Amino acid sequence: MPLLDVTGLVKTYGSRRVVDGVDFEVDSGEIVGLLGPNGAGKTTSFRMTCGIIEPDAGKVVLGGLEVTRWPMYLRARDGGMGYLAQEQSVFRKLSVENNLLAVMEMLGMDRAARRKRCEGLLEQFDIKHIRRSKAMFISGGEKRRLEIARSLISNPKIILLDEPFTGIDPVTINNIQRIIRRLREDGIAILITDHREQETLAITDRSYVIRSGKVLCHGTADEVLNHPDARKYYFGDGPKLGDAA
């Protein structure tokens, strides 16, 4: 049984059905991409999976629990879901260290546990040298690493990443890709949606391409990049990028 099993998602706004029966799944220790052109329904599907939007129909099962109607905080607390928003979510006026400690305090961790966990995350994400810097003064890549570190505080089984490669330079993208691969090695499931399909496909085990509210195709990077309909409607008719994986 997959860790995350999404079946038959439907969402209608007015007379327009923006998501029409989307299914996908993610296993533990697997990186899965959710791709598609603007207006395809991928973002709505992703946000229904997170608990930001409630579906009109369909199911979201996380770790064997049906969480379809659960708000995001319950999915995080009781379902083992971590979430990285597209928009920067750091506390700008707090130091890097206090960004981590504040979340730990909200989760009810005792002082000794907070300190130990904080040191580990600062080391793991190479942000120890900026621990006392206010978040408003650190770089975009450092903010991204801090956000991912915060998403790991609750020891999630799965992390949902919304546009993790947006607004950062190529070197930082490579660093974030390495971090995501390490999370997979630790057995954490990853679901990514991003408009930068090449960077996403370079690290995914499988991807789903959404078009007109439905899954157009799914498979490995080679399989989706060489799928005739995916090339026609999304990737274009340029060179086949079969070495993206």
Region roles according to the model:
Residues 65, 101, 112-130, 178-181:
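Conserved ABC ATPase "signature" region
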